[in-house]
């Protein structure tokens, strides 16, 4: 006789507490990295999205050597958090300000809460928050935990002090078990790669060993922030339609609903859609049956004349900032970038940007250095399972002038979208969506053509220099013959003319070879001859 099955439910907090690896917390090293990452991303979303030049300070301290507990503290100068929202923002899983139809670094309302859950599993210190919204006269402080069964914040302590220093922004400190020696290189790489695409930000990083690294602001130019937009009809399903209807504050007809609640639908398009769906324009939208909602969604999917989704919801890095960051960090001989035009997949707009840096101080390797970004987030882990890596690996770089298997090259790809198709909640690799993969390939080919042109011009220049260097060995003989002819047998004039002609020829070639002086030409000539 079989035992009875016991059925129960889990709160979101309990689920991710039981499955921390799904949120990017499988072990102490990854947990330390993921905590730093989540806090920095929150700080950037609180600054540049709102037109504030970011000043971000990151500190990691070892506070319990025996148990390897680290305290991660990130402070920003962002817009701050309304005090009434702080407990839920840090203590309720799947609660977020980022459930909007625009590009954001965060997506799930999970990140920092996953860090809090992991923290609670291994030690007893609460998360500490200090925040002050812009123009606030108070600085609000909180110490919080998460009630895992109820998925609710537990307020351990709260208070406020007078804001005498005009501070606005947020400070978050989390104590968490970590493995700094194993996480060190990843954390440094994450901050460096973040800095590459945010050269308008200032970062100060103090690690557990006491080392302080300063990343200075290189420009005051901030990319245009994304705007919240209405949903595109091609990207919605039945349940989203029902949510939109339930949230309506006006008693719309079906036609009014389509025109006012969706992008890419005007009066004419609405009439066509309703005719195809067999729905009456004047019927109240809240009276739609389940079957009618299904017909409407199916008509959306079949209709081929929608305008592409608006790109106002997206914020690109921009070609100037990409090249500025690549040049600052890698000091290459050549850097180029491209920002492609907006495209869409499944009704979600997206833009691909690509950059390449070549030569200079870039180390030589068997593979190019690949920098992957999604919504301005560096993707450090799971590189080989990402669609960006796949496209880079499959591209025939020899077509673009890379002739050997030794690469001295950095390849950068940024995908921004209202919905990044991540493979997991850890947000480290992008799935192989056909439309996105094709656009990444087009972007890389376009920027690779710029590299090919540079390499072609460089090779032509090198070949021309070789020819000019070959001419150097004939200068003594040519100058002597010309001097003898011009001097008409006068030995004193022969010597004088020969020196003048020789110097003149050296100077003529110097303009072509870009060497500093004649002695350098002669040195080059001697080395070349040897």
Curated annotation (Swiss-Prot):
One of its GO terms (biological process) is DNA topological change. Its EC number is 5.6.2.2. Gene3D superfamilies: 1.10.8.50, 3.30.230.10, Histidine kinase-like ATPase, C-terminal domain. It holds the Pfam family Topo-VIb_trans. The keyword Nucleotide-binding applies. Keywords: ATP-binding, DNA-binding, Isomerase, Nucleotide-binding, Topoisomerase. Disulfide bonds: none annotated. InterPro entries: HATPase_C_sf, Ribosomal_Su5_D2-typ_SF, Ribosomal_uS13-like_H2TH, Ribsml_uS5_D2-typ_fold_subgr, TopoVI_B, TopoVI_B_transducer. ATP binds at residues 42, 76, 97-98, 106-113, 427. HAMAP family: Top6B. Belongs to the TOP6B family. PANTHER family: DNA TOPOISOMERASE 6 SUBUNIT B. This is Type 2 DNA topoisomerase 6 subunit B. It comes from Saccharolobus islandicus (strain L.S.2.15 / Lassen #1) (Sulfolobus islandicus).
């Amino acid at each position: 006789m079989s035992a009875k099955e016991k059925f129960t439910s889990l709160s979101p907090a309990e689920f991710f507490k039981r499955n921390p690896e799904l949120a990017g917390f499988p072990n102490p090293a990854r947990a330390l990295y993921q905590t730093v990452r989540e806090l920095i991303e929150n700080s950037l979303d609180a600054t540049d999205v709102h037109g504030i030049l970011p000043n971000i300070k990151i500190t990691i301290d070892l506070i319990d050597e025996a148990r390897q507990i680290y305290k991660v503290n990130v402070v920003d100068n962002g817009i701050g958090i309304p005090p009434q929202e702080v407990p839920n923002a840090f203590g309720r899983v799947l609660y977020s300000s980022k459930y909007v139809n625009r590009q954001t670094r965060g997506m799930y309302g999970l990140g920092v809460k996953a860090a809090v859950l992991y923290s609670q599993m291994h030690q007893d210190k609460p998360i500490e928050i200090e925040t002050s919204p812009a123009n606030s006269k108070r600085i609000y402080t909180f110490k919080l935990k998460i009630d895992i069964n109820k998925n609710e914040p537990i307020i351990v302590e709260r208070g406020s002090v007078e804001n005498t220093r005009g501070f606005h922004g947020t400070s978050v400190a989390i104590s968490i078990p970590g493995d700094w020696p194993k996480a060190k290189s990843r954390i440094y790489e994450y901050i460096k790669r973040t800095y590459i695409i945010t050269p308008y930000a200032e970062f100060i990083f103090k690690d557990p060993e006491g080392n302080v690294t300063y990343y200075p602001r290189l420009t005051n130019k901030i990319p245009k922030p994304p705007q919240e937009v209405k949903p595109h009809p091609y990207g919605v399903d039945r349940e989203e339609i029902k949510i939109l209807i339930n949230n309506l504050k006006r008693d719309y007809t079906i036609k009014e609903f389509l025109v006012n609640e969706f992008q890419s639908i005007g009066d004419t398009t609405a009439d066509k859609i309703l005719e195809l769906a067999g729905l009456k324009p004047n019927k109240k939208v809240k009276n739609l049956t389940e079957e009618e909602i299904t017909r409407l969604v199916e008509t959306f999917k079949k209709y081929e004349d929608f305008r592409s989704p608006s790109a106002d919801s997206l914020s690109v890095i921009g070609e100037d900032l990409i090249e500025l960051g690549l040049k600052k960090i890698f000091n290459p001989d050549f850097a180029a970038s491209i920002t492609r035009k907006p495209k869409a997949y499944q009704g979600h707009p997206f833009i691909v940007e690509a950059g390449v840096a070549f030569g200079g101080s870039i180390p030589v390797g068997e593979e190019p250095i690949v920098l992957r970004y999604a919504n301005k987030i560096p993707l450090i882990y799971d590189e080989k399972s990402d669609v960006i890596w796949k496209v880079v690996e499959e591209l025939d770089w020899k077509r673009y002038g890379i002739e050997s298997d030794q690469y001295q090259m950095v390849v950068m790809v940024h995908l921004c979208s209202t919905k990044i198709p991540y493979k997991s909640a850890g947000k480290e690799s992008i799935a192989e969506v056909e439309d996105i993969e094709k656009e990444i390939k087009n972007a890389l080919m376009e920027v690779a053509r710029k590299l090919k042109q540079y390499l072609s011009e460089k090779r032509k220049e090198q070949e021309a220099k070789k020819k000019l260097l070959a001419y150097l060995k004939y200068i003594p003989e040519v100058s002597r013959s010309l001097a003898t002819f011009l001097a008409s047998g006068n030995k004193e004039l022969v010597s004088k003319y020969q020196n003048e002609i020789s110097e003149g020829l050296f100077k003529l070639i110097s303009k072509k070879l870009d060497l500093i002086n004649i002695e350098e030409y002669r040195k080059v000539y001697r080395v070349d001859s040897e």
